[in-house]
């Protein structure tokens, strides 16, 4: 019997000038040289930490690029990272949404992995602005047992998340799956005999019942799926995608990003859990918005969206020429000091100020060099 494989993957899609969207944490468009360098650099602490705690699992990096900076090429070779060059076929049309137009690349990855995975394999797709701080064997065990481990981030149902609320997501779910099915059944009913109509009315129409409970918002930064569930999501994707395109054409509220899609598809497939919440948390360390609580430092994975140009950049500098560590406690202290988990110290604020200043100077130099070419 073949031993199931645990896959751990992250990705980067480089946008062209024509299809570039805005990246809020970087403060630039996706075709910016600064954005490109930031997302290349954070791969270093990501893969260094995930490989340390998972020496035997399969680590993958997906991109539309086939060449990378020399330091990344060396890292991939040393840490045994497989790179997969994948085109972006699930790209939404122009004018879709202001930010993160690259996010639907996730579904190209799922299509690819369906062909590669066995039913009992597991796949963790994780954003690259994450650090792995503990082994994830139990996560993979949970995924294998329950089919998925999702990060439920729907603690504020009234909040607009990337342009849409949970109430609007629920309305879209009902209109796509319930009202659309009703309309189709009404069309079919005109073609049926009286006996067929009576039989249809007696059938259990569970999926045709309007949903009143709000759809849960499952974050796209940390998704763990079993192989057979990957296949189910891929099968369900086209119906929702085509419906969403109809709403876009009609200028109606739509599902703007990959996590919106995941949330509605998961609801459709009756996949409901918050298993990943015990392993990961979105840890905002922004001075005006800090979500870090005491005890968060014990999580297996830290998701650090604000630290791309700060703590994660410093960890890139630390690991770039030597992507390994032996003393886990010493690394935890360094990661804590650089990222502000669990406490943003005065020393971190000073380091952040200097780091951002240097990055601004670097970005300005790149801009000046380009306009003189």
Set out the residue ranges of the language-model regions.
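N-terminal anchoring/stem segment of glycosyltransferases
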Residues: 1-95, 118-119, 350-357, 361-370
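Short, solvent-exposed loop/turn segments at secondary-structure junctions
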Residues: 12-17, 65-68, 91, 130-132, ...
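Catalytic core and acceptor-binding pocket of nucleotide-sugar-dependent glycosyltransferases
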Residues: 181-191, 196, 201-305
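A short, glycine-/small-residue-rich helix N-cap motif at loop->alpha-helix starts
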Residues: 97-106
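A short, conserved beta-to-alpha structural element at the edge of catalytic cores
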Residues: 149-178
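Long, low-complexity C-terminal extensions of enzymes
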Residues: 289-370
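GT-A fold catalytic core of metal-dependent nucleotide-sugar glycosyltransferases
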Residues: 107-159
């Amino acid at each position: 019997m073949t031993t199931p494989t645990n896959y751990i993957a992250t990705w980067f899609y480089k946008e062209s000038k024509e299809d570039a969207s805005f990246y809020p944490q970087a403060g630039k468009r996706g075709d910016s040289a600064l954005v490109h360098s930031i997302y290349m650099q954070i791969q270093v602490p990501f893969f260094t930490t995930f490989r340390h705690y998972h020496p035997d699992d399969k680590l993958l990096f997906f991109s539309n690029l086939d060449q990378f900076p020399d330091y990344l090429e060396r890292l991939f070779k040393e840490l045994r990272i497989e790179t997969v060059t994948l085109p972006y076929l699930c790209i939404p049309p122009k004018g879709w949404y202001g930010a993160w137009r690259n996010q639907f690349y996730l579904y190209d990855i799922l299509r690819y992995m369906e062909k590669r995975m066995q039913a009992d394999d597991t796949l963790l797709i994780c954003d690259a602005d994450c650090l792995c701080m503990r082994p994830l064997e139990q996560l993979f065990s949970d995924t294998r047992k329950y089919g998925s481990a999702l990060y439920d981030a729907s603690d504020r149902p009234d909040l607009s998340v990337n342009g849409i609320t949970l109430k609007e997501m629920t309305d879209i779910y009902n209109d796509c799956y319930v009202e659309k099915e009703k309309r189709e059944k009404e069309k079919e009913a005109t073609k049926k005999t009286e006996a067929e109509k009576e039989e249809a009315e007696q059938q259990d129409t569970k999926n045709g019942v309007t949903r009143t409970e709000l759809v849960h918002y499952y974050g796209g930064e940390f998704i763990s799926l079993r192989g057979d569930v990957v296949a189910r999501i891929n099968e369900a994707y086209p119906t929702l995608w085509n419906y969403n395109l109809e709403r876009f054409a009609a200028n109606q509220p739509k599902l703007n990003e990959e996590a919106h899609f995941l949330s509605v598809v998961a609801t459709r497939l009756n996949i409901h859990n918050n298993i990943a919440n015990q392993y990961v948390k979105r840890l905002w360390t922004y001075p005006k918005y800090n979500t870090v609580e005491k005890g968060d430092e014990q999580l297996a994975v830290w998701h650090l969206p604000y630290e791309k140009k700060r703590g994660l950049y410093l960890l890139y500098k630390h690991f770039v020429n030597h992507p390994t560590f032996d003393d886990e406690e010493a690394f935890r202290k360094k990661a804590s000091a650089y990222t502000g988990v669990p406490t943003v110290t005065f020393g971190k604020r000073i380091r952040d100020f200097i780091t951002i200043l240097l990055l601004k100077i670097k970005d300005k130099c790149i801009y000046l060099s380009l306009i003189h070419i």
